[in-house]
Design a protein with these regions (language model features):
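A compositional/structural signature for long, glycine/proline-rich flexible linkers
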Residues: 1-465
Length: 465
């Protein structure tokens, strides 16, 4: 056999064998206590394997089909790759880039009147309620497999642009230039891919202060699921259109195989540790921080997105909590808003951080879907069965799970203008006595219609062709 061919076979088999071992480490994160998984029960174990497969699905694209010279936007999270308490209202997108180069993003949206604060016509197709692009230096959240990535300075946002500032042509089209600096004669939409920092990198003090973006990511947030349509984005590295990558080689394949396994393992390890240690989701365990933990049926303090929140959309305010309910109990949430955000949403997640079913069941609600009471308070009801009230959130049978409210502001308001949120546990049979008398009754037919709209929207949002 040709020596070169024999070496290729051996190196590829070695890479494959290493990848299988690394995937076994990822699998161990489902049920080995030292890997800090959620408490074991039949459903948590079953969903843990599905959760792992979601990371494997995403890692195929990320390891084998990402090229900063010829980028393509891909789903970072979706109905098949749920995690990190993903927002049921969002398309998460990302692509790797080289921030030293220039890129052009193109899109074409339906009616964008609401981006400029104008009313849209009833019954017409619309752009997503809110869109944001963010260019960042560093790894995607969780890729290091180590909580040290949360330290200030490990990641740097170099620029961002949201739909309140995107200039759109009359036909709905728009372009966005990404570059280390804005060309002097350029007046259009722009995102900077370079930021010079003044503090040394926490793990590499010798690193130069220039931080070039390594990826661009973002969200499309949907409010009116019946009429808002996802936007297809194209991205091109300027000066590189019409080129192709070098022929795929055994060395590249071996590198990609290893990278695939590392992505999966590191994501499993990181998020288990994140929920267990800084968040204290499961109470005090070995290695947790004394006094830090999610109390049940209450919310922690609202925070702006940061490393402490595991990243997140940079314009968001977040709160968090864990519901814990018996079948004869419910949780009534009261959300008071002073300064109207661009977006408000409330999502439920299982203890792996997967969003609860939001197409075939109502595991989330947003500002368009929520009913607001006459006193201006948004009251939501978390319960295991339908209480026949407008703002019901379905636990999908989980006795406990994450509660994740979100409020998005283009400019973060002063803390005294932030919303407030609280929770009260009540007997299921007494729900209506804790709600205003004006609270409507929702019939089974009306609930089915709500779910029909959700099912159709989710199919459109994540269509593959």
């Amino acid at each position: 056999m040709d020596t070169g061919l024999a070496n290729s076979k051996e190196s590829l088999r070695d890479a494959w064998d290493e990848m299988i071992l690394v995937l076994e480490e990822a699998r161990n994160a489902i049920d080995q206590p030292n890997m800090m998984p959620p408490p074991a029960n039949d459903r948590n174990l079953a969903e843990g394997y599905r959760y792992l497969m979601g990371f494997m699905h995403a890692a195929v694209e990320r390891a084998f089909h990402c090229d900063p010279a010829r980028p393509q936007f891909r789903n970072a999270l979706s109905v098949m790759t749920r995690g990190t308490i993903d927002n049921a209202d969002a398309v998460y997108f990302y692509t790797p880039i080289d921030g030293r180069e220039q890129y052009l993003i193109r899109g074409c949206a339906e009616d964008t009147s609401h981006w400029q604060g104008r009313a849209t016509a009833n019954g017409v197709r619309k752009a997503p309620h809110y869109v944001i692009f963010e260019a960042s230096s560093g790894c995607l959240a969780g890729d290091s497999g180590d909580l040290s990535e949360l330290r200030p300075g490990m990641k740097t946002q170099t620029g961002r642009l949201d739909s309140s500032l995107i200039e759109v042509n009359p036909d709905g089209s728009f372009d966005i230039l990404l570059a280390p600096e804005r060309p002097t004669d350029y007046k259009g939409n722009f995102i900077c891919t370079l930021k010079t920092v003044t503090r040394a990198h926490p793990t590499d003090p010798a690193m130069e202060p220039e931080r070039y973006a390594t990826y661009v990511s973002g969200r499309q947030l949907f409010n009116d699921w019946e009429y808002e349509e996802a936007i297809h984005f194209e991205i091109t590295q300027i000066g590189n259109a019409g080129t192709h990558a070098p022929a795929y080689s055994p060395q590249q394949a071996a590198d990609d195989i290893r990278h695939f396994g590392e992505i999966v393992r590191n994501q499993m390890v990181f998020w288990n540790a994140f929920w267990t240690i800084p968040m204290g989701t499961y109470g005090e365990r070995q290695g947790t921080i004394p006094g830090i933990g999610f109390k049940r049926n209450v919310f922690n303090q609202i925070n702006a997105a940061s490393g402490a929140t595991g990243g997140g959309m940079s314009t968001n305010l977040y709160a968090g909590g864990i519901f814990e309910l018996n079948t004869d109990e419910a949780l009534i949430i009261e959300n008071r808003i002073q300064l109207q955000p661009h977006y408000v949403g409330f999502q439920l997640g299982n203890l792996w951080g997967e969003s609860m079913e939001y197409a075939n069941q109502i595991g989330s609600l947003n500002g368009h879907q929520m009913s607001v009471d006459p006193d201006g308070v948004i009251r939501l009801v978390i319960a295991h069965s339908d209480p026949g009230v407008p703002n019901w959130l379905d636990t999908s049978g989980h006795p406990e799970g994450f509660m994740s409210p979100r409020w998005a502001y283009s400019t973060t308001p002063d803390p005294e203008q932030w919303p407030s949120i609280s929770a009260t546990k009540v007997p299921f049979k007494d729900i209506r006595s804790h709600l205003p008398e004006s609270t409507a009754f929702v019939t089974q037919e009306q609930r089915s219609e709500q779910i029909r709209i959700r099912q159709r929207h989710v199919q459109r949002r994540f269509r593959a062709f």
